[in-house]
Amino acid sequence: MAAEPPALRLRPPGSTGDSPPVPRLLGGCVPLSHQVAGHMYGKDKVGILQHPDGTVLKQLQPPPRGPRELEFYTMVYAADCADAVLLELRKHLPKYYGVWSPPTAPNDVYLKLEDVTHKFNKPCIMDVKIGRKSYDPFASSEKIQQQVSKYPLMEEIGFLVLGMRVYHLHSDSYETQNQHYGRGLTKETLKEGVSKFFHNGFCLRKDAIAASIQKVEKILQWFENQKQLNFYASSLLFVYEGSSQPATTKANDRTLAGRFLSKGPLTDADGLECNNNFHLFGAPPNGMSVGKSLSKAYSRHRKLYAKKHQSQTSLKVETLEQDNGWRSMSQEHLNGNVLAQLEKVFYHLPAGRPEIPEAEVRMIDFAHVFPSNTVDEGYVYGLKHLIAVLRSILDS
């Protein structure tokens, strides 16, 4: 079993100091604020909880599902595990910290897991069920019929979006979609439906798509090289950073935005380089609208970025889609509080970083994992189709 979890932030990812108080439950735990799928707190199930130390608590399901998932985590994270396949699998799972029970209810058992979102400021989260079948080999005919009726296209598509939570820059808020959104996607609307997860209200986050593809491809590689386990009704949890700047840089950005709009213009010679090499030149010349001035500054920033990184062959973070998002923003969204809008522009810009952004893709939900001696063709099929859809979005 893994060591004790590190001390994590007290507030849920994406929350603010003005967030309403969260009800405290067993042992000081609170409902997981950023859960996008599964049993939710406040309904017929207790849902996923967050422990005061920052870990996630998943209540053990009734037999045989709960004991089966516990056995899976215990096997993979056994201290004496020497199986290369399982050791490699750990890289794609949330860290497991054993089981936990509240002092007042010792018979209630919870899996204690890493909160994959803890390092993100504004985490965008999507839960995608993988595989051509969402029922296991021992399911009854009634169970099979029930699962097939929920999403008849599962066999053909190979995955199902169970929920998503996307941070929108322009409103500083989250948009959420539940399982009904995913079940409503057809072969014709699947690409657009998945791309919604990567759109921040200004542009399509192709950098996050590319980073996610890399993670999924590593999981696919693991599945293609193992014949020990088959997974049913299991999911991938996607997470990427919705805010392009850490919270600690916002004060600096506000100062920069203020100087841009101040009466004392910055000359070309006074070009600023702040935070992650974002270049800003000059205040709006007399007679030039703020929108046009911003477009000009952005154009110069892009030219400098292209010149600086033209020899690099890494993935291009800035795209035509982002250009269009900029033009739309500069023409339509600069009414009212110009300073506030300008700050959002700074967060939106890629800031000249050539590296791949922070993103996570982890496997979750293991109540239907079974020993096998063959490649898990259903899961592999789903992964390959998901990668194909993501690549299609990236290349569009």
UniProtKB/Swiss-Prot annotation:
Residues carrying N-acetylalanine: 2
Give me the residues that bind substrate, please. 65, 129, 143-150, 179
Give me the reactions it catalyses: 1D-myo-inositol 1,4,5-trisphosphate + 2 ATP = 1D-myo-inositol 1,3,4,5,6-pentakisphosphate + 2 ADP + 2 H(+); 1D-myo-inositol 1,3,4,6-tetrakisphosphate + ATP = 1D-myo-inositol 1,3,4,5,6-pentakisphosphate + ADP + H(+); 1-octadecanoyl-2-(5Z,8Z,11Z,14Z)-eicosatetraenoyl-sn-glycero-3-phospho-1D-myo-inositol 4,5-bisphosphate + ATP = 1-octadecanoyl-2-(5Z,8Z,11Z,14Z-eicosatetraenoyl)-sn-glycero-3-phospho-(1D-myo-inositol 3,4,5-triphosphate) + ADP + H(+); a 1,2-diacyl-sn-glycero-3-phospho-(1D-myo-inositol-4,5-bisphosphate) + ATP = a 1,2-diacyl-sn-glycero-3-phospho-(1D-myo-inositol-3,4,5-trisphosphate) + ADP + H(+)
Skewed-composition ranges (Low complexity): 1-13
Q: Position of motif Nuclear localization signal?
A: 300-310
A cellular-component GO term for this protein: nucleus
Cofactor names: Mg(2+)
EC number(s) for this protein? Answer: 2.7.1.140, 2.7.1.151, 2.7.1.153
Record-linked InterPro entries: IPK, IPK_sf
Q: Where in the cell is it found?
A: Nucleus
Major location category of this protein: nucleus
- According to the record, the residues making up region (Disordered) are 1-22
The pathway is: Phospholipid metabolism; phosphatidylinositol metabolism
GO molecular function annotations of the record = 1-phosphatidylinositol-4,5-bisphosphate 3-kinase activity; ATP binding; inositol-1,3,4,5-tetrakisphosphate 6-kinase activity; inositol-1,3,4,6-tetrakisphosphate 5-kinase activity; inositol-1,4,5,6-tetrakisphosphate 3-kinase activity; inositol-1,4,5-trisphosphate 3-kinase activity; inositol-1,4,5-trisphosphate 6-kinase activity; metal ion binding
Kindly state what the record says about how the cofactor is bound. Binds two Mg(2+), but the interaction with the protein is mostly indirect.
Keywords annotated in UniProt: Acetylation, ATP-binding, Kinase, Lipid metabolism, Magnesium, Metal-binding, Nucleotide-binding, Nucleus, Phospholipid metabolism, Phosphoprotein, Transferase
What are the Phosphoserine sites (modified residues) in this protein? 19
Annotated GO biological process: inositol phosphate biosynthetic process; necroptotic process; neural tube formation; phosphatidylinositol metabolic process
* Family to which this protein belongs: Belongs to the inositol phosphokinase (IPK) family.
Cite the PANTHER family for this sequence: INOSITOL POLYPHOSPHATE KINASE, INOSITOL POLYPHOSPHATE MULTIKINASE
Function noted in UniProt: Inositol phosphate kinase with a broad substrate specificity. Phosphorylates inositol 1,4,5-trisphosphate (Ins(1,4,5)P3) first to inositol 1,3,4,5-tetrakisphosphate and then to inositol 1,3,4,5,6-pentakisphosphate (Ins(1,3,4,5,6)P5). Phosphorylates inositol 1,3,4,6-tetrakisphosphate (Ins(1,3,4,6)P4). Phosphorylates inositol 1,4,5,6-tetrakisphosphate (Ins(1,4,5,6)P4). Phosphorylates glycero-3-phospho-1D-myo-inositol 4,5-bisphosphate to glycero-3-phospho-1D-myo-inositol 3,4,5-trisphosphate.
Stated name of the protein: Inositol polyphosphate multikinase
Query: Which organism is this protein's natural source?
Result: Mus musculus
Q: Which gene encodes it?
A: Ipmk
